[in-house]
Structure formats: C-alpha cells, structure tokens
Amino acid sequence: LKGHRQGRKIIHFDTEQGMFHASKLAKRPLVMNGWMQDDNYHFYALRTMDYKQRRNFIEYILCTKFKDEKIGLVIIDGAADLVSDVNNMEQSTEVQELLMRWSGELNCHISTIIHSNYGSSKPTGVLGSALEKKCESQIMLEKNSVNKGWVTVECRRGRNRNFDTFSFAFEENGLPKFVDNDYDL
C-alpha cells in the first residue's frame, strides 16, 4: 500500500473468498503498514454476484463512483469469475478488452489473478491465454516443494523489469514475511 502512490487509490476486488476470509484479506495491508484505515484503499467482496453482475459492479466502481479520482492500482482476484466459462472465446475477449480499456482510460495498473491448470504452469483456459498475451508481467506463485510452508514467487515474463525469484512464509499472525535464506530455482 505504501509504494509510490502519490495519493492515488487502490481498489481491490475479490471474487472467490467468503466474508470471513475476505475480511481478513481486506485488513492485511492495513495491519502490515500499522494503519487503522486508509481512505485510498477500497476492498470489495463479490462472491455472491454472478459473472455479469461482477463485471457491471467493477465498471460502476471504476468508471462512476471513482470517475474523477486518481486510481493507481486495481486488483481483481479472480479473473475467471468475470466469465461463465474460461474457455468461452467471446467472453474471454470481452474481459481482455475491458481490462485494456479500463487501464487506458483510468491510466492505472490492473493486476489480475488467474489459476493455472492442474499439473501445468499455464493459466487456465482461453481466458488465461488471452490475458497472458496482453499482460505486462506474468508472476507465478506456488507452494515451495523443498521448504514446506513457503510460497515461491517467480517472474515468468515481463515487458519491462523482471525480478529475482523469492519466497515468503506466513507468520503465526497470518502476515507474510520474506524468507531470508531463500534458494535459487
């Protein structure tokens, strides 16, 4: 949340979590920074909506509610939940075009999360392939097979600056912490 925001808003949409986990997720960035609140951080849990309602809600928040305010980062955790079927070419193209339009019109970065196929590192479905082709950076998180409890973060590809692979673990309080004795993949 700190970064180089310069007063811009961070808007986080979660499509999968139930209210208990969504609430914990919404509070985590504030706790990590030692803040009680941040008027520029907005979190929305969309689990109970269908895919069309989710798209319309996101459009409303970005293009109506915060229309005249500077948005720096939009996080959509659950891009697959913006379509009825991740292999539907038409819906996948619509979502890809929506994301590109929003990032262009709002002059902001949009980060989406999409799962990979089982037994593969490829993003799920036609939607995953479409987003992969247009993304600025593709970052993969996976459970570390050597050190249990660690999550390894790898920059699979980037149009600009890549970063070195690193790992983190969750502390007892549920907050992530970089692992100092990380290993090379």
Where is each model-derived feature located?
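Phosphate-binding/switch region of NTP-binding enzymes
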Residues: 5, 12-13, 73, 90-181
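Conserved inter-motif catalytic segment of the P-loop NTP-binding fold
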Residues: 4-90, 94, 171-175, 181-183
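P-loop NTPase nucleotide-binding module
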Residues: 1
